[in-house]
């Protein structure tokens, strides 16, 4: 039997203010899946993503990534995850190539290898021609694709995105879906939260 890419069992999260965001969530996402958590604001989507990406501590339950327990072996599990947060959070005064190379370096990727990966990811995101421009000059859709390219620099087996198309027009949304489909087709399991498909 194939090991799930992500396995969540009886996951609960109650915040300190008493708000319960997750009530016994269980799900399996299989390798190669393109999985969307669809729901309105307040449904617990971002909390679930937060728990899986180790930004939020669960109250109870378990999470494993390709069979590695997130609580017992957090660093091993996190090596397999790439995260794209909802907000754009890179330095607008850096060039896309530098953003990617520096990110990879933070995770221990040697500079020569990081440069190779950066070229690959910028080409995959259709941003290679923008590699040496200031990132503040990129369009909104390009910035979103740069966020995906950055997350892919560690070659994750599982890519998690929180509302990747929030606040963007239909044309940018189409471009984002195309980029994510290409990432998924290349073998990365994709999980995202959204209000709409």
Cite the ranges covered by each PLM segment.
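Conserved ABC ATPase "signature" region
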Residues: 101, 105, 112-130
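Conserved ABC transporter NBD signature motif
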Residues: 61-69, 76-77
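Hydrophobic anchor residue at the start of the ABC signature
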Residues: 148
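Catalytic Walker B motif of ABC-type/P-loop ATPase nucleotide-binding domains
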Residues: 159-162
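A short, proline-enriched helix->beta-strand linker immediately N-terminal to the Walker B motif
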Residues: 153-157
